[in-house]
Regions:
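Extended terminal
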Residues: 1-12, 256, 262, 306-313, ...
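N-terminal type II signal-anchor transmembrane helix
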Residues: 1-43, 169, 513, 521-523
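Elongated, acidic membrane-bridging lipid-handling scaffolds
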Residues: 125-232, 296-388, 393-398, 477, ...
Length: 523
């Protein structure tokens, strides 16, 4: 009798298992269609496709295969492709009478291109109103207490045939996503993320999140970057007239991103080995001007903006080179600083955070010892900064293209120095610029043998004037231009005012008007 009871029990369990498995098989396709339909009902501008669904009733789990998310306006390639996503009941929570699940997302691939970004920017429906959270909640009937993403890869393609930007080996772990053990208004979900940036750099993030905050996810975390190669962003930089070659970025900081508060606190960052040039050309002059307006507007919007704090404790640029290429001039020329060292402390967009201090050293045109010290305060009623700078003993032969473009002459030898102090506040500027030319020889028969007769005569006259102006004991040509007045545009950004002051100083004081001196040379 006892043996018959066991046979019946085993048979019942086997039969129930068979029915359950068969039920799972027959339910798979209708359930797949239901999940796909529920997701797409809430989404705007995007479509989700689920290739296959497997329900495992005995394990209280479900698996989704070949999941894709496409942008309706640009469906190829898919923005997201997930080979496998599985969700299973967390048994430990079930013993406490709570139904929660673990979700595992394996090897997801995220592809973003410039065309898709432009479409998103042009769309009338903002990203936060696309319905992502509603879609996820609609197909997640139980609470998700553990989410793991393993071996994810993010690829950004700017324009063919430029090399794509990749963030690989991304692993994410988040817990307590449905506020199971938390109070409202906190960041209930511990969050960790690691990844590899552009093949050799490292990214990490450690903090907390509220995945169901509206209208977007809220995050508060520490994050860091190590040895991220900057050369990979060359395609993006080129659209802004920037040539970027080499350099690495390392840094650490904290972020807080919530519907009511945005904080980006960079505690320390170092850029090493940067090579960067900005190109100005006649063809892009109007675009550059419009871009400058946009930068100015953005600076005004974030300056002392409530709910937004941008802060950098310490930023350094070391062993780098920066240049400016003027292709609008004839001939073209390049101004540059080698051996560049930049140190910024206490940058912020809020007056309450104090004054930013900057120090810059380098070699102007590869030879002129350069030292710049500056203090900047966040803008309220216009730019507010003070700057003191010196460039000493620049080999003037390296400046010949510049001299030809703006003075119609060049030099065979000579040394250039300049000293300046400027103060800008309340729409007014005060200061001086003092250029110094030493041992300058403008005309050289061997160097200038290919030039026409009139150019040779002109350069000979310029050379004669420079000799008349020389302080004989030290063989120096010195002038000083005092600067005082009001800014043409008091609402211009600090950087725009600074660039304009440098341009005016260079072309009105440093190139001191040789033609004027020819008309009335001083002895």
């Amino acid at each position: 009798m006892r043996r018959t009871w066991w046979i019946w029990l085993i048979g019942a369990v086997a039969g129930l298992s068979t029915i359950t498995i068969a039920l799972g098989v027959f339910v798979d396709e209708p359930l797949r269609r239901y999940v796909e339909r529920q997701l797409n009902t809430h989404l705007k501008g995007y479509t989700v496709r689920v290739g296959k669904l497997d329900l495992h009733p005995l394990r209280f789990s479900v698996e989704l295969f070949d999941v894709a998310i496409v942008q309706d306006a640009n469906p190829d390639p898919a923005i997201v492709h997930v080979p496998r996503l599985s969700s299973s009941v967390q048994w430990r929570a079930l013993l406490s009478a709570r139904v929660v699940s673990d979700v595992l997302v394996e090897r997801p691939q995220i592809h973003i291109n410039l065309k898709q970004i432009r479409q998103e920017a042009a769309d009338d429906v903002p990203l936060k109103d696309r319905g992502w959270q509603e879609a996820v909640q609609a197909v997640t009937p139980v609470k998700v207490n553990l989410l793991q993403v393993v071996e994810a890869e993010v690829t950004y393609i700017d324009q063919e045939p430029l090399e794509p930007l990749r963030l690989g080996q991304v692993n994410l772990r988040a817990e307590n996503i449905r506020n199971i053990r938390s109070e409202v208004g906190e960041f209930p979900s511990p969050l960790q993320l690691q990844g590899v940036v552009f093949g050799t750099g490292n990214l990490w993030l450690d903090g907390h999140a509220d995945f169901l905050a509206t209208p977007h996810v809220a995050v508060k975390a520490q994050l860091g970057l190590e040895n991220v190669p900057l050369g990979y962003v060359k395609p993006i930089a080129s659209r802004y007239n920037i040539i970027l070659k080499g350099g690495t970025l390392s840094g650490a900081g904290a972020i807080e991103y919530t519907p009511s508060r945005k904080v980006a606190h960079l505690q320390q960052a170092t850029v090493h080995g940067l090579r960067i040039d900005y190109i100005h050309s006649a063809q892009t002059a109007e675009v550059e001007q419009e871009r400058g307006k946009q930068v100015r507007q953005a600076a005004q919007q974030v300056s002392n903006a409530p709910g937004l704090l941008l802060r950098a404790d310490e930023v350094s640029i070391v062993k780098s080179q920066i240049g400016f290429i003027n292709e609008a001039a004839k001939p073209h020329y390049r101004l540059f600083l080698t051996d560049l060292e930049v140190h910024l402390t206490n940058f912020s967009n809020h007056l309450s955070e104090g004054t930013m201090v900057a120090k810059v050293t380098g070699k102007f045109m590869g030879s002129g010892q350069t030292l710049v010290g500056a203090t900047f305060r966040p803008e309220t009623d216009g730019p507010d900064f003070a700057i003191a700078a010196s460039i000493e003993n620049t080999d003037m032969q390296a400046m010949n293209q510049l001299l030809r473009a703006h003075g119609n002459f060049d030099v065979a030898r000579g040394f250039f120095s300049v000293y300046t102090e400027l103060r800008v506040k309340n729409g007014a500027v005060r200061g001086y610029v003092k250029p110094l030319f030493k041992e300058m020889d403008v005309y050289d028969a061997h160097q200038d043998r290919e030039k026409n007769l009139f150019q040779k005569i002109y350069e000979g006259l310029v050379g004669g004037v420079s000799q008349l102006l020389e302080n004989r004991p030290r063989e120096e040509v010195a002038t000083k231009a005092n600067i005082a007045g009001h800014l043409e545009n008091p609402q211009a950004s600090t950087w725009q005012v600074l660039v304009n002051l440098i341009q005016n100083a260079f072309f009105q004081a440093i190139l001191p008007g040789f033609e004027r001196e020819l008309r009335g040379p001083r002895r």
